[in-house]
Curated annotation (Swiss-Prot):
EC number: 3.6.4.13
Organism: Mycosarcoma maydis (Corn smut fungus)
Keywords tagged on the record: ATP-binding, Helicase, Hydrolase, Nucleotide-binding, Nucleus, Ribosome biogenesis, RNA-binding, rRNA processing
Single GO biological process annotation from the record: maturation of LSU-rRNA from tricistronic rRNA transcript (SSU-rRNA, 5.8S rRNA, LSU-rRNA)
Motif Bipartite nuclear localization signal positions after renumbering to this chain: 283-299
Compositionally biased intervals (Low complexity): 31-47
Compositionally skewed regions (Acidic residues) per UniProt: 519-528
Name recorded for this polypeptide: ATP-dependent RNA helicase HAS1
Record bears the keyword Endoplasmic reticulum: no
Amino acid sequence: MAPHKSDDVDAEAELASQLAADVAAAESSAATKAKASSASSSSTPAAERQPFSILDLSEPTRKAIDAMGFKTMTEVQARCIPPLMAGKDVLGAAQTGSGKTLSFLIPAIEMLHRLKFKPRNGTGAIIISPTRELALQIFGVAKELMAHHHQTFGIIMGGANRRAEADKLQKGVNLIVATPGRLLDHLQNTKGFVFSNLKALCIDEADRILEIGFEDEMRQIVKILPNDNRQSMLFSATQTTKVQDLARISLRPGPLYINVHADLAASTVSRLEQGYVVCESDRRFLLLFTFLKKNAGKKIIVFMSSCNSVKYHSDLLNFIDVPVLDLHGKQKQQKRTNTFFEYCNAPCGTLLCTDVAARGLDIPSVDWIIQFDPPDDPRDYIHRVGRTARAGNSGKSLLFLLPTELGFLRFLKVAKVPLNEYTFPSDKVANVQGQLEKLISKNYYLHQSARDGYRSYLQAYGSYSLKRIFDIHKLDLAKVAKAYGFSVPPKVNITIGTGLKTSASSSSGSGGKRKEVDVDGEGEDADGEINPKRQQSDRRAYYRKNHQNGGSKDHFRKSGANATGNKGGKQWSR
């Protein structure tokens, strides 16, 4: 967080957790790419868009917009910025990737400039974001927009150094980007945090904030913040009952409702080619492995349902020389930040993640979205695939479904999501099941990681709300276990209902369960720590065996090199 302009240059000062200098450099580069994507993503043809020059902007803001390379506004920007600059409250709904970040930042910054806010005046504008990564991204754009302004700005979020944040809040931060939990903490406990002069409150991705369990925090935040002459703006991709309730308590009566793209025939952009593949549980990893080998030069995001599943597949794929990055809610903040910006700046590569990366993030030039584990709701599907086909680019997505999950397609159809079925010849899928089971049985570290991933997959599956489609009783546990490298299902405990436990170790399904949720809305279910010495020993032993006997890692490397998948006879990797 940064109370003085000189402090705003480095992301590590803003994070107040002494992140490495290379992360700060990555943030600047990623923010530039993100804002370009945010500004240019729109269904409105460029020739029909209105220029930023028609807005009554201050010279510092105009210089910043010119330096950022923006000439025309997207539809959401053209419809939101003028009424917001006129002081109206706005309830906005728009497709993901429509460019709404500038829609709320420009009016907030102009307000601070017009009122000549200084550090001694405290905080005049607060932007609330559901996740740390999205908060970092918004902060990066704000930093460039405020490059020629004298007002101060900063970021406060979970995982950063709270004391350093408090010190800078006490010095005065005019514009704050924040996550809900840390913001409420400072509002309640930080002495000298001046927010009595607050003039603008923006709640971004409001539906996501509420979905991941911050409803109580948001109500407390709105209650604490002054509402006299406060302008509020609330952006949400979907207008749920909870979002409407939050809008009632946070917005002034009679807000302007702006719904961009409400009349479109599809909920996703036309440049996105979408498909699904029907695959039995025991073939899922083999197909994923084949796909990643075939598309090694592409930029791919793979969504999974739990932190432990992401961790296991990352451990396994990196071990067998399929390089991937991983991002999930159990990682420490520095690791999450490093990974996020590393992937943003990479020209190609694979990111395994939970839904922590599904909402709002502008990750440049993503070629493929793979939904290895289906989402719980069509809205989540739409936000996942929204990470590709941005800024006028094309993209592709692939949804993995079990035969018992085909009913989910009906929900996607109702949500105006067009999908084609993809097929793949079984003889083109890498047959590495034997090598996988041998590796998992002999490597203690991977065995433990696989067991945690298997258990978390079952727990997450039991937490689906669409239980008629995602019915844990219909899972063949023997086949699920094979996908995690087990010849026989391991015995694991999973939580059922409101706290009872059962063991799952047979080929029949287990009862449903309620997934515990952490601050990012992801399952938290670790059994314990792995002995790092045992891990290193296993790795050394395995490498020795490979070099001496041409072990199974070489087979993994060769398998899948020529594998293809077809959609109507065409290769996936066109």
